[in-house]
Amino acid sequence: MHAVRYSQAFIPTLKEAPADAQVASHKLLVRAGFIRQLGAGIYDYLPLAKRSLAKVEAIVREEMDAIGGQEFYLPALHPAEIWKESGRWDVMGDNMFRLKDRKGGDYCLGMTHEEIFTAVARDELRSYRQLPQVWYQIQTKFRDEPRPKSGLLRVRQFTMKDAYSFDVDRAGLDRSYEDQRRAYEKIFTRCGLDFVAVQAHSGSMGGSESSEFMVRTEAGEDLVAACPRCRYAANTETATSRVAAEADGPGLGAPEKFATPGVVTIEALEQAPHSVPARRQLKTLVYMADEKPVIAVVRGDQELNEAKLQTATGAVAVRPAHPEEIPPLMGARAGSLGAVRFTRARVLVDPSLADRKDMVTGANEDGFHLRGVDVRRDVLAHGATLAELRTVKAGEGCPRCDGTLDVFKALEIGHIFKLGTKYSESMKATVLDAEGKQVPIVMGSYGIGVERILAAAIELHHDDNGIVFPMAIAPFHATVLTLGPEPELRKAAEEVVAALGKEGVEVLFDDRDERAGVKFKDADLLGIPIRIAVGKKGLAAGNVEWKLRKGGAVELVPVGEVARKAAEAVRAAT
């Protein structure tokens, strides 16, 4: 195997990270010469990055092929018509890059390929006998991120492995989904990632069920609620919990209005002279679900989860109502709102409030609130419905056992969906079933962010000196360096490099005319798993220095044995 000579390689390392780099992976990928920024959310992948990304892709291919996946390569440029068939042309909004050709035709740069693969299935699949099918590709995607940041974690151009399963029924989809789940677990394990699979929100993808694969890291933008006792785990967009029961008094026979001039926040109502604890307040929020008003009610000390509201309403998009939209509907401005006997819009109430009594809420009159509210009597009895709306908090009870939930930041590295017939029905992708009837194909969708795997690995595996790569995705398995300019050291190092190559070990040979300290620092920064140093003292005794990047002590290894030792280390770790 051919070694790469450092003196001839393009590895533009830096002593300092960019001023705008905030997360470890961004800092280290730039400092180690893996990436350079071309524009906001757009990166050049330099040779070291290309080597590591190619290894990630190879692992993904092996595991996809192992479950019967067949690789495609479909266009990144899509005509608008196919996205309009599914209804997602408008749903994607500003997140989609859109363009016109010279004839005025509408196109987009693909964010994902559900529509495109469904079109292939519609045109080519005719019978249940052709199913199941598992198709995938590793291809460039585009997303017009409003705030690209954190290096490779939030970009506008990225590489995704997207796979799609096609089955004749739900049972087949269940099998395909589990095949993908197991394949994902193998992929992430091989890439050296400590991950957790969690229940997730399907969002604009649609479908009946989805799971995200998450890496726990402060660099993540998602929040996961997990129970260490029973292993329940879910994105907070879908997570539920047990809330401790409140000891409510009997309340009043009917709500009673009282003056609250200038009180327009939960916190203000907690203060004297009113002194109403937040947990005894009803927080009433006005949202627009597909531009239709909906009222959401949660406890005063709880936060509304917009993803849950979207699920509860079945809306494509939800947003907070603008201040000027609220008074015509509610009769008051924000801060004095309530849902008591309210029937002018759909009202959703979090289940944790169902049996609460003696609560306080806005009176839908500026400067006034109501006390003595019985949620079931005064809200639910007038057409409101229960729906999971609140965001769970750390310390709340697990919904599956007697444990308590931990909530932590996490980074999504993969997402799998049971799409069902969402796309096949809208795009008329059908096959004949065993009874000769036309039925919509039952689909699944499965995505992995290739660059995110690289970035996540670095977030998990780094120290003060640089990257600490897992062997399977390191740009090289080993680096060989000399500890002096003497010809005999160079000759011995060349022989070690050749022996390593014969064993299949990928080597970066640091043949630069630099001090040993510089070479050691660069080796640590690049994160190459094995460091082999050839020095005068050791060589005189027939040895070389061996050190593992992952916290290993320096060992002396006979020159004739080092290649075998390295090959064994590579095989054990990949």
From Swiss-Prot:
The keyword Protein transport does not apply. One of its GO terms (cellular component) is cytosol. It comes from the Bacteria. Its main location: cytoplasm. It holds the Pfam family tRNA_edit. Catalyzes the attachment of proline to tRNA(Pro) in a two-step reaction: proline is first activated by ATP to form Pro-AMP and then transferred to the acceptor end of tRNA(Pro). As ProRS can inadvertently accommodate and process non-cognate amino acids such as alanine and cysteine, to avoid such errors it has two additional distinct editing activities against alanine. One activity is designated as 'pretransfer' editing and involves the tRNA(Pro)-independent hydrolysis of activated Ala-AMP. This is Proline--tRNA ligase. It comes from Anaeromyxobacter sp. (strain K). The lineage of its organism: Bacteria, Pseudomonadati, Myxococcota, Myxococcia, Myxococcales.
